[in-house]
From Swiss-Prot:
Swiss-Prot/TrEMBL GO biological process terms: DNA recombination; DNA repair
Quaternary structure (record): Homodimer which binds Holliday junction (HJ) DNA. The HJ becomes 2-fold symmetrical on binding to RuvC with unstacked arms; it has a different conformation from HJ DNA in complex with RuvA. In the full resolvosome a probable DNA-RuvA(4)-RuvB(12)-RuvC(2) complex forms which resolves the HJ.
Chief location: cytoplasm
InterPro entries (alphabetical): RNaseH-like_sf, RNaseH_sf, X-over_junc_endoDNase_Mg_BS, X-over_junc_endoDNase_RuvC
Its biological purpose: The RuvA-RuvB-RuvC complex processes Holliday junction (HJ) DNA during genetic recombination and DNA repair. Endonuclease that resolves HJ intermediates. Cleaves cruciform DNA by making single-stranded nicks across the HJ at symmetrical positions within the homologous arms, yielding a 5'-phosphate and a 3'-hydroxyl group; requires a central core of homology in the junction. The consensus cleavage sequence is 5'-(A/T)TT(C/G)-3'. Cleavage occurs on the 3'-side of the TT dinucleotide at the point of strand exchange.
Domain of life: Bacteria
EC code(s) of this entry: 3.1.21.10
Gene (name only): ruvC
NCBIfam families: PRK00039.2-1, ruvC
Originating organism: Shewanella baltica (strain OS155 / ATCC BAA-1091)
Enzyme active site: D8, E67, D139
Cofactor(s), by name: Mg(2+)
The name this protein goes by in its record: Crossover junction endodeoxyribonuclease RuvC
Family of this protein: Belongs to the RuvC family.
Amino acid sequence: MAIILGVDPGSRITGYGVIQCQGRHQIYLGSGCIRTSSEELPGRLKQIFDGITEIIRQYQPDEFAIERVFMAKNADSALKLGQARGAAIVAATVANLPVAEYSATQIKSAVVGTGRAQKAQVQHMIQQLLKLPAAPQADAADALGVAVCHYHTSQSLIALSGRATARTYGRYR
């Protein structure tokens, strides 16, 4: 029964989503957004670090997954996004959580089935997968998508490793 914290980083709004995995089922535990104030970037990064630290304290996750930086048209935006990711990753590392990273395409593929899915499609599928009464806000849905992607990816790796170890002299046991 692993608890996974997924994070969709941003310098102004950082989404988070927490799920518990029981066998093939994913159970929604919580989600939301860390909204930083309009102060300078170092202060916003501290708010992200403190916010993720509090979420880790509250939910006690076993694993941490975060969306990778994509190449934005604006280099300054990409740098700020990278710094926001760094603040979240440091919070996870301080809590001794293993950190996994996924691209937006990987996340959308795991949740919707196509890497080119729109935000509304991700929100809808997260609502369906986690049996939520309403679609979560976009940043929280993206973070829940990161957690779901991590769960599916880790399950696939476990299945593959099981097959690899069951093989003896070119035959399956």
